[in-house]
Amino acid sequence: MSSPVVTRFAPSPTGFLHIGGARTALFNWLYARRFGGRMLLRIEDTDRERSTQAAIDAILDGMRWLGLDWDGEVIYQFARAERHREVAESLLASGNAYHCYASAEELAQMRETARAEGRAPRYDGRWRDRDPSEAPPGVKPVIRLRAPTEGETVVEDAVQGRVTWANRDLDDLVLLRSDGTPTYMLAVVVDDHDMGVTQVIRGDDHLTNAARQSQIYRALGWDVPAMAHIPLIHGADGAKLSKRHGALGVEEYRDRGYLPAALRNYLVRLGWSHGDQEVFSTEEMIAAFDLKAIGRSAARFDFTKLESLNGLYIRNSADSVLVDAIEVILPARGPERGLPTSLTPDLREKLLSAMPGLKERAKTLVELLDSAYYLYAPRPLALDAKAEGLLAGEAPERLRALLPALEALPEWSAASTEAAVRGFAESQGVKLGQVAQPLRAALTGRATSPPVFDVMAVLGRDEALARLQDRLAA
């Protein structure tokens, strides 16, 4: 009987949860859910100088916002340092590791010699079989793995296939530094083993680490977990992903108005495919996810495709869900628009009423919020340049003549205001647009908006007429 699937996401808290890390977390989450297993979260905080609480908070918040829940408590690698030291000492006792007293100067000379000879720098094993009694006085040694020197180290990778390294090219790596702190290589192996990880899914920049870590597993007599090294994400131009391409923190995507479900859907298709299907519900992703369907070449990040997919998710979302999502981005996007960081009951009600018209064109929540400007714009409305153009010439007099017809309406709705404006345009012998366009500009301050009669209905009689009177008095 096979053991239950356990995956892990193990970010270093030296910065935000970037988009590549988010995809790695998603793939681990999907694989665990696909097989009814568990995904664990480990914070690799052994770099004490660069690890920050703010970065830890950003990672956890980003995971929660994306809807990627983890099983059990968060595991902090630094807190397990004593266990890592214990394992290093056990390797020493079994003869699978040894004390190395090479000085910093000696190591630097090894690197320099290797460069001069045109080969990769590697430790030359000078303390591998040397008698410890020859140790120089007052020098604290490191502990190195006694790695195999002949044959090959092989990793059967679910994405990369069979990958081999000649053992002569892999030197005796450091397990424990001279100050007693464990190295990343040792800590990862011990933590993955103790956590019961059965499947490692991570970026292919860790592929060489897989060889090193496999050697540690075998020296300890532990089972090596299955491996899957996924290709990195590049920009649309094929270059290494940078901020201009979209190498941003997950919180930046949130604040730019992307829906978590849309971002999940976009990320799952970066490197993984399932036929020609582009749009996946979470349930469909889980049911279909397969490591063998991940390609080996770098995926390309395309903002245009992400925006298009996000727009689709916006159009298909319930109005109340979108209003809640707007409230999430208000702390970041509200103040610059003169909005509070949370919705007032009145504005929430107006947004709900306006949402059917607002969401048809928006590709992001920020666009949606900007389209809703007319709902929260202070009076008298400031006009953009195109709106000013629409209100030039005969437009003000037409609106002045229209005003009594609107004031006389017994019932105020999209249908009744449309009938009144159409009737007025016919009586004046002009096209509907010659009245509706200036009316839109007067009511919203913009040349584009949701359908103008929907705007009038959402604003209500008093607000709509007051804005029209403001413009006529200007």
Curated annotation (Swiss-Prot):
ATP binds at residue 243. It is found in: Cytoplasm. Its EC number is 6.1.1.17. One of its GO terms (cellular component) is cytosol. SUPFAM superfamilies: An anticodon-binding domain of class I aminoacyl-tRNA synthetases (SSF48163), Nucleotidylyl transferase (SSF52374). A motif ('HIGH' region) lies at residues 11-21. Residues 113-140 are annotated as: Disordered. Its main location: cytoplasm. Disulfide bonds: none annotated. A motif ('KMSKS' region) lies at residues 240-244. This is Glutamate--tRNA ligase 1. It comes from Methylorubrum populi (strain ATCC BAA-705 / NCIMB 13946 / BJ001). The gene is gltX1.
